[in-house]
Curated annotation (Swiss-Prot):
Record protein name field: Monocarboxylate transporter 14
Keywords, ordered alphabetically: Cell membrane, Membrane, Symport, Transmembrane, Transmembrane helix, Transport
Transmembrane segments annotated in the record for this chain: 30-50, 76-96, 105-125, 129-149, 161-181, 193-211, 317-337, 355-375, 381-401, 410-430, 446-466, 476-496
Keyword Glycosyltransferase: no
Length: 512
């Protein structure tokens, strides 16, 4: 397992907080109880967001017929939606720090639904860029990141399996949404299909409502300190998880903020002899002051995570992981966007209608996430090794796909793509091992942002290459080569770890 979260520079206050954290009792909902509701909530979020996006190849064909634009331009609609969902990750981290996961996810569900509904009235591809690409993509990002982060907070053991089970929603969603969108487009047209999908997306608000923050526990034998029971934000062992307003004054002890809250508390107590309307006014002011404290604290935590003394970018292994994410995701997204048209070019539409190739990817994707997650949790198996093997299998499949021209051979390659891409369930686990639980929200936001850039540029690039060559072969070859570059960055990480271990041994030998 990684120990590289030690590479991040913490100050002395963080070290003291880490010592205090050891005295905490295990939270009853960690690894059990409501934790499994987090898995269920995240599962449905993946169905509604990632599943719908992986089924956009159906709508891509409809948009080509409706607007008569080039494949490269039309592919930007799907790419914008997928890309923005992931690119906004670091900024959604600010919302999570300030408002909590529950509120962020609920707002995201509303914005995503609005984007789908407005897209039903689009007059051209450029309109879809705004309504579907930007609006629906932003809403998806606001609901997606909290779903991943909350599972990470609620699980300490079996994290890989929990993330694997929750992210299988992508596979189920791809299968279900592909069938659903095909049926809706055939029966009602693509515009009404998007309107109906917008209504379904409101269920993201229900999923967000289930993201209950970890409740504070009464602690015994808490060491005396200037800051009683001070705990780091965003730890699964922290008493603060979703950022309730009532905890704001306890967790921000800066002199100015403390004075503001204390003064208002004193005024409220003195106001008991005042008319009721004065008491209500003091309570409103107190709530506003607590909200101000919370926003300041959330922004400070978010800013320090990226640019402060605890910057994630001081972790060399994490930086190498970011470079991998920049190249990898497009190789997974491109088949979903362009496979329906590839099948049409090969005159395999009849067989594909019986059992779509994207559904094969989706089904094997489900098994891949669960199996790879379970294997990675075995004590004798390294998560890193499982992650690397799956990556090599996926890039090999991408290289082989253009060579297949029959339905059976394409089905085999799609099965390999689906199963090996199950490593996505390991990404939060690997990220958490690299930076620690406290920095998971910010760190995973950066990783999915890098994935988003890859998803944003990949499909339009493949469509542009097709417009020039009238073949998708070169698109897959080039994306496969870029993926190999990303894997080379992954291989840098073990080398860095070996160098660090040798340095430690040399230092220890010198002291002896």
């Amino acid at each position: 397992m990684y120990t590289s979260h030690e590479d991040i520079g913490y100050d002395l206050e963080d070290d003291r907080k880490a010592k205090n954290k050891k005295t905490l009792k295990p939270h009853p909902d960690i690894d059990g109880g409501w934790a499994w509701m987090m898995v269920l909530s995240s599962f449905f979020v993946h169905i509604l967001i990632m599943g719908s996006q992986m089924a956009l190849g159906v709508l891509n064909v409809e948009w080509l017929e409706e607007f008569h634009q080039s494949r490269g331009l039309t592919a930007w609609v799907s790419s914008l939606s997928m890309g923005i969902t992931l690119i906004v990750g670091p900024f959604i981290g600010l919302f999570i720090n300030t408002c909590g996961c529950r509120q962020t996810a609920i707002i995201g569900g509303l914005v995503n639904s609005l984007g789908w509904v407005l897209s039903a009235y689009a007059a051209n591809v450029q309109s879809l860029f705004i309504t579907f690409g930007v609006a629906a993509g932003l809403g998806s990002g606001m609901a997606y990141l909290p779903a991943v982060v909350m599972v990470g907070r609620y699980f300490q053991k079996r994290r890989a399996l929990a993330q694997g089970l929750s992210t299988t929603g992508t596979g189920f969603g791809t299968f279900l949404m592909t069938v659903l969108l095909k049926y809706l487009c055939a029966e009602y047209g693509w515009r009404n299909a998007m309107f109906i999908q917008g209504a379904l997306s409101l269920n993201l608000c229900v999923c967000g409502a289930l993201m209950r923050p970890l409740s504070p526990e009464k602690l015994e034998n808490c060491p005396e300190a200037e800051e009683p029971c001070a705990l780091p934000a965003y730890s699964t062992e922290s008493v603060k998880s979703g950022g309730p307003l009532g905890m704001a004054e306890e967790q921000d002890r800066r002199p100015g903020n403390e004075e503001m809250v204390c003064d208002l508390q004193t005024q409220e107590c003195q106001g008991q002899t005042h008319p009721r309307k004065n008491v209500c006014a003091f309570r409103v002011l107190k709530t506003v002051s607590q909200l101000t404290v919370q926003v300041r604290r959330g922004f400070r935590d978010w800013h320090s995570g990226y640019f402060g003394t605890a910057s994630l970018f001081t972790n060399r292994m994490f930086v190498a992981f970011i470079f991998w994410a920049l190249f990898a995701y497009s190789s997974f997204v491109i088949p979903f966007i362009h496979l329906p048209e590839i099948v049409s070019l090969y005159n395999l539409s009849e067989q594909n209608d019986t059992f779509p190739l994207t559904s094969i990817i989706a089904i094997l994707h489900i098994f891949g996430k669960v199996i790879l997650g379970a294997v990675a949790d075995l004590p004798c198996i390294s998560v890193w090794n499982v992650f690397l093997i799956a990556n090599f299998t996926l890039v090999l499949s991408i290289f082989l796909l253009p060579l297949m021209h029959t339905y059976a051979s394409l089905a085999v390659i799609c099965a390999l793509i689906g199963f090996s891409s199950g490593y996505f369930s390991l990404m939060p686990v690997v990220t958490e091992d690299l930076v620690g639980t406290e920095h998971l929200a910010n760190a995973y936001g950066i990783i999915i942002c890098a994935n988003g850039i890859s998803a944003l540029l990949g499909p339009p690039f493949a469509g542009w290459i097709f417009d020039i060559t009238q073949k998708y072969d070169f698109s897959f070859y080039i994306c496969g080569l870029l993926y190999m570059v990303g894997i080379l960055f992954l291989l840098i990480q073990p080398c860095i770890q070996m160098i660090d271990q040798s340095r430690r041994k040399c230092i220890e030998g010198a002291h002896v």
